[in-house]
């Protein structure tokens, strides 16, 4: 088991599959990172050397917005919506659905969890 950018990667998975578990890295970016570093597509996480792992961490940290940066950006966007008191900001505060979903019979559990 290995941790890269706060994501737990299982050793038995291939690098191309396991790297998509990192927040902010999708299939396309996983292929780009692997191609730039010259890592085979069939190699598994547990077969990587320490040097290759360090290279992957360094490349992901430099070129891509990942994990905490992504979460911070999302939180800042929500805070901005709340501060300007727009419809979506108010719905975020209430814990209600934002995009016009039905609330009479659905979304009850979501509202209960937030109001406790």
Curated annotation (Swiss-Prot):
Subcellular compartments: Mitochondrion
Keywords of the record: Mitochondrion, Ribonucleoprotein, Ribosomal protein, RNA-binding, rRNA-binding
UniProt keyword annotation of Ligase present: no
A GO molecular-function descriptor: rRNA binding
Keyword Mitochondrion: yes
Subunit organization: Part of the small ribosomal subunit.
Record-linked PANTHER family: 30S RIBOSOMAL PROTEIN S13/40S RIBOSOMAL PROTEIN S18, SMALL RIBOSOMAL SUBUNIT PROTEIN US13M
Protein name: Small ribosomal subunit protein uS13m
Gene name tied to this protein: RPS13
């Amino acid at each position: 088991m290995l941790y890269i950018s706060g994501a737990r990667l299982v050793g038995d998975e291939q690098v191309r599959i396991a790297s998509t578990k990192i927040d902010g890295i999708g299939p396309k970016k996983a292929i780009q990172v692997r191609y730039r570093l010259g890592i085979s597509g069939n190699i598994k996480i547990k077969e990587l050397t320490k040097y290759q792992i360090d290279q992957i961490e360094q490349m992901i940290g430099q070129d891509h917005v990942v994990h905490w940066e992504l979460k911070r950006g999302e939180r800042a966007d929500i805070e901005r919506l709340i501060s300007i008191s727009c419809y979506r900001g108010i719905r975020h505060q209430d814990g209600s659905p934002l995009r016009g979903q039905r609330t009479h019979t659905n979304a009850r559990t979501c509202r209960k969890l937030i109001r406790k």
